[in-house]
């Protein structure tokens, strides 16, 4: 199942479909009144759809801190039975972590409808002025922690947000670094977990030759990569004795074995048959816990295998890097899946329709997964924390995090008006399906007219390498974009991010080479705007639409900033 917000701009595409929709519950006197109300709700951003296998539900819902308040429901396709309908609508409420699923009516309900709601677990809240029937939802949440080595700091950032929202789990499943983080989360000591990741370096994980490492991050990356390669070839993997020592110093075996909930399960791979082994940690003897955690995290051949009772075990990622199936088998009806993009096998499974899967995965690269760098750990902690905050509705944005995105929408509407009225350019491209498809491919997410302002602003920030590890006001992000245009910032950026992986180093080099050419293009666009060369600008929009559009948007935003208007020497 898939749930999406529906926007007013989609009416042209969806109108004929909605005209076939039938009202399921008596919110309005007629089906047509129900349809009309749905489109009016798009103005308040309260219109939604849930896409199932045989039908789609279109509904009006108001999200409050505790409940999903439903005020209208229409169905297109096969009419679901009542049991299926209530399961699906409650699935939507659970998807947004709501305590209650509620229905609101304007007029009193007949005995038939009251009986139907009561039969499916709903009760009327008589203390409210409105007619509201609600059901308290039950959760059996499984936290699924994937493998990914040094990327694991991201998972602790996610957990920090979950603790702030008092979201608890019944089951934790972890592979590799997910197993290590799983046992930290099981002990419920956030400060310990944060402190560990903020101070964790490669020499605390792997036993490598003691050599002086360069202060230059690029040179250090090459040094540590070579050391690991030698260890893999000569010794069959680097020893993880430092990690074993660190883990044992953090484990509270007595506390772990007393914990009844959540239950922790780790995944490792047995040699030589490469069999997946799922281990219930709280059913082990106290002296076995560290062994099975380390077995799951032994990324052979970069790291040596783990020997337990005469058997060899290596990283669980060789068989099941994202153990969603283990969580479902152990009773999870909701799975919060924290994927940190580690190497390994993602097992193909069919998630039951009644199970709510929440995927938390960074749009951004998390760096190298074998080199542990304190600054990069801190950066990834922030990314995980902010991504989960967005998932829970605390902030907005996709690539970046915003307190509010309303101003971005306003800037975009004014910019389109500026193109037409001031520059006298045609903007018919926004009416073309190809424009939207290309934009979605570039942005890597759904984009409609109402969200285009945020998408274009985020693409501009990405283009200028603005960092995503903080919450922005829209004007603050614009100021960051403009500053990146006018100053050398690579050293400062890398100091804040920490160690990069090989692909990131290549992208930085590529950007440095392209920077002069991109600045030349911006200057050329600025010259055409100043000289009112509208035909040439229109031609560039036809031949290089997105590059030209982003450059025009950058120039427009620059002129709109109050500090720029007051201090023209900054241009």
Residue ranges and their predicted role:
Residues 1-37:
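Short amphipathic alpha-helix that is part of the acyltransferase structural core
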Residues 83-87:
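Acidic-aromatic/histidine active-site loop/patch
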Residues 176-187:
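Short glycine-enriched nucleophile-adjacent loop
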């Amino acid at each position: 199942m898939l749930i999406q917000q529906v926007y007013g701009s989609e009416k042209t595409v969806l109108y004929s479909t909605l005209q076939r929709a039938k009202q399921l519950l008596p919110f309005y006197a007629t089906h047509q009144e129900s349809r009309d109300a749905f489109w009016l709700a798009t103005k308040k951003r309260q219109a939604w759809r849930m896409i199932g296998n045989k039908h789609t539900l279109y509904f009006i819902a108001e999200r409050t801190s505790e409940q999903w308040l439903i005020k209208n429901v229409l169905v297109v396709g096969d009419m679901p039975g009542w049991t299926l309908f209530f399961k699906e609508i409650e699935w939507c409420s659970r998807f947004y972590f709501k305590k209650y699923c509620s229905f609101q009516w304007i007029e009193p309900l007949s005995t038939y409808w009251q009986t139907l709601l009561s039969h499916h677990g709903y009760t009327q809240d008589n203390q409210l002025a409105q007619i509201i029937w609600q059901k308290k939802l039950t959760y059996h949440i499984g936290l699924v922690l994937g493998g990914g080595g040094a990327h694991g700091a991201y998972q602790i950032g996610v957990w920090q947000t979950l603790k702030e929202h008092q979201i608890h789990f019944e089951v934790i499943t972890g592979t590799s670094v997910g197993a290590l983080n799983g046992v930290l989360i099981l002990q419920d000591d956030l400060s310990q977990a944060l402190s560990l990741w903020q101070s964790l370096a490669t020499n605390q994980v792997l036993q490598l030759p003691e050599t002086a490492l360069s202060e230059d991050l690029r040179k250090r990356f090459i040094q540590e990569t070579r050391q690991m390669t030698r260890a893999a070839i000569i010794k069959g993997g680097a020893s993880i004795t430092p990690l074993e020592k660190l883990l044992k110093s953090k484990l509270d075996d007595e506390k772990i074995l007393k914990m009844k909930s959540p239950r922790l399960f780790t995944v490792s791979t047995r040699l030589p048959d490469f069999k997946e082994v799922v281990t219930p940690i709280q059913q082990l003897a106290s002296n076995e816990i560290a062994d099975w955690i380390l077995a799951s995290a032994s990324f052979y051949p970069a790291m040596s295998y783990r020997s337990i009772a005469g058997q060899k075990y290596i990283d669980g990622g060789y068989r099941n890097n994202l153990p969603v199936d283990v969580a479902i088998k152990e009773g999870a009806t909701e799975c919060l899946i924290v994927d940190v993009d580690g190497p390994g096998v993602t097992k193909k499974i069919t998630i039951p329709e009644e199970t709510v899967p929440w995927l938390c995965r960074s749009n951004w690269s998390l760096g190298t997964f074998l080199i542990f760098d304190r600054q990069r750990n801190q950066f990834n902690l922030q990314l995980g924390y902010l991504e989960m905050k967005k998932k829970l509705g605390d902030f907005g944005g996709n690539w970046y995090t915003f307190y509010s995105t309303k101003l971005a929408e306003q800037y975009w509407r004014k910019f389109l008006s500026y193109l037409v009225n001031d520059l006298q350019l045609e903007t018919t491209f926004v009416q073309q399906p190809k424009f939207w498809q290309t934009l979605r491919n570039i942005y890597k997410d759904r984009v409609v007219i109402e969200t285009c302002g945020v998408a274009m602003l985020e693409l501009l920030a990405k283009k200028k390498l603005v960092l995503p590890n903080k919450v922005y006001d829209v004007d603050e992000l614009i100021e960051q974009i403009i500053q990146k245009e006018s100053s050398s910032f690579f050293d400062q950026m890398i100091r804040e991010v920490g160690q990069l992986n090989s692909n990131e180093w290549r992208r930085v080099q590529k950007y440095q080479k392209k920077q002069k050419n991109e600045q030349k293009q911006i200057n050329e666009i600025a010259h055409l705007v100043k000289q009112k060369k509208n035909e040439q600008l229109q031609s560039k929009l036809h031949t290089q639409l997105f590059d030209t559009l982003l450059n025009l948007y950058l120039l427009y935003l620059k002129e709109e900033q109050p500090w720029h208007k007051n201090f023209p020497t900054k241009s």
